[in-house]
């Protein structure tokens, strides 16, 4: 293992005339090339991103529609429960002497169960919307990253020749070996 590490370290000590390094001078890093690369990424990624967002929007809208349908069903159930409640209330009035407390408990249980059902449906709708939004955001991030990576790799591959590739790879391996020794 030490021999492998030594070989990486020796690769990292090239003469500075032919090696790569980080240039922190913003004026020397050629911001025009960076802006061209970003412009190409934005130009080509815009259509894909737009289509992806439209698809996600449709899915979210469909989910919202489904949730609204569930909500309407819950409202219908609530109306049925209210009509049953009215019926129970009229019966309670008739049988007040015989079992007022029993009927009152049934009424409260019916109301509580109806409200719990509505709360559960509302929570389900909100969770579904939140889940779909998060999934859409994650997919957009992944697509944008993939497009940027493809564009950057394409630009790098078109600009670098084999010798430059080998020198860059060797320099990076040397830097990684040096960083590994520092962390060890």
UniProtKB/Swiss-Prot annotation:
Annotated InterPro entries: ATP_synth_b/b'su_bac/chlpt (IPR002146)
Keywords, alphabetical: ATP synthesis, CF(0), Chloroplast, Hydrogen ion transport, Ion transport, Membrane, Plastid, Thylakoid, Transmembrane, Transmembrane helix, Transport
CDD domains reported for this sequence: ATP-synt_Fo_b (cd06503)
Highest rank taxon of the organism: Eukaryota
Entry GO CC: chloroplast thylakoid membrane; proton-transporting ATP synthase complex
Compartments (UniProt record): Plastid, Chloroplast thylakoid membrane
Other notes: In plastids the F-type ATPase is also known as CF(1)CF(0).
PANTHER family registered for this protein in UniProt: ATP SYNTHASE SUBUNIT B, CHLOROPLASTIC
Role description: F(1)F(0) ATP synthase produces ATP from ADP in the presence of a proton or sodium gradient. F-type ATPases consist of two structural domains, F(1) containing the extramembraneous catalytic core and F(0) containing the membrane proton channel, linked together by a central stalk and a peripheral stalk. During catalysis, ATP synthesis in the catalytic domain of F(1) is coupled via a rotary mechanism of the central stalk subunits to proton translocation. Component of the F(0) channel, it forms part of the peripheral stalk, linking F(1) to F(0).
Family: Belongs to the ATPase B chain family.
Binding partners and assembly: F-type ATPases have 2 components, F(1) - the catalytic core - and F(0) - the membrane proton channel. F(1) has five subunits: alpha(3), beta(3), gamma(1), delta(1), epsilon(1). F(0) has four main subunits: a(1), b(1), b'(1) and c(10-14). The alpha and beta chains form an alternating ring which encloses part of the gamma chain. F(1) is attached to F(0) by a central stalk formed by the gamma and epsilon chains, while a peripheral stalk is formed by the delta, b and b' chains.
Protein name in the entry: ATP synthase subunit b, chloroplastic
Gene field: atpF
């Amino acid at each position: 293992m030490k021999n492998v590490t030594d070989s990486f370290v020796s690769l990292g000590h090239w003469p500075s005339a032919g090696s790569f390094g980080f240039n922190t001078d913003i004026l020397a890093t050629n911001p025009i090339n960076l802006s061209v690369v970003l412009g190409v990424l934005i130009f080509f990624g815009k259509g894909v991103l737009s289509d992806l967002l439209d698809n996600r929007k449709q899915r979210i809208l469909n989910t919202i529609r489904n949730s609204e349908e569930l909500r309407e069903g819950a409202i219908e159930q609530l109306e049925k429960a209210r009509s049953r409640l009215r019926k129970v209330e009229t019966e309670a009035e008739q049988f007040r002497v015989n079992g007022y407390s029993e009927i009152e408990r049934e009424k409260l249980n019916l109301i509580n169960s109806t409200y719990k059902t509505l709360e559960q449906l509302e929570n389900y709708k909100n969770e579904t919307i939140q889940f779909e939004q998060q999934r859409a955001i994650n997919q957009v991030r992944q697509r944008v990253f993939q497009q940027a990576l493809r564009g950057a790799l394409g630009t790098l591959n078109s600009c670098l020749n084999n010798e430059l590739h080998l020198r860059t790879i060797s320099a990076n391996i040397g830097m990684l070996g040096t960083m590994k020794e520092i962390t060890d």
